[in-house]
């Protein structure tokens, strides 16, 4: 798992392209080997190299995104999209509830909850992700000089969150 991410980041750096990542899974399997734990550090270092090269790193959370994935590289994105209702967590709800000794809201650890607390920039249906990502990258990379407010409004009903996320 970690090797694939590191390879993808290196490919983005070598080709000077953005890195768009779709994390999905229960996390790095720490109990299987120390390699998984080491990969948390290695993937984080790879993302730092991407940032040193001033390349955008977009994360699109899918269901579920949990464990070591959220404890390392998934939360380091420049922009975070999430699918509606997806689980975004480090530890399970019961573990946290037992630790804090209080009842947690029913939407705890959902993309909506995480967005409300500032860790997700925008919730987007999967079918709309291509358009949203393309638009955002054209803004971030300033490559498409034809992008103007009229075109943006035709592409997206509500561009304010994208413009805010891009600034």
Q: What is each model feature region?
A:
Residues 2-3, 37:
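Short, conserved loop/turn and helix-capping segments at secondary-structure boundaries
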């Amino acid at each position: 798992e970690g090797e694939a991410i590191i390879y993808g980041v290196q490919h983005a750096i070598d080709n000077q392209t953005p890195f768009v990542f779709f994390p999905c899974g229960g996390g790095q399997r720490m109990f299987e080997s120390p390699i998984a734990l080491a990969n948390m550090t290695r993937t984080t270092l790879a993302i730092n190299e991407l940032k040193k090269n001033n390349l955008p790193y977009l994360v699109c959370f899918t269901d579920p995104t949990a464990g070591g994935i959220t404890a390392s590289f998934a939360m380091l994105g420049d922009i975070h999209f999430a699918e509606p209702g997806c689980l975004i967590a480090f530890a399970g709800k019961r573990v946290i509830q037992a630790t804090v000794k209080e009842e947690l809201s029913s939407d705890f650890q959902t993309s909506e909850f995480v967005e409300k607390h500032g860790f997700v920039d925008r919730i987007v249906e999967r079918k709309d992700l291509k358009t949203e990502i393309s638009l955002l990258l054209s803004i971030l990379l300033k490559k498409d000089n034809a992008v103007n407010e009229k075109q943006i409004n035709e592409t997206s009903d509500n561009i304010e969150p994208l413009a805010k996320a891009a600034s």
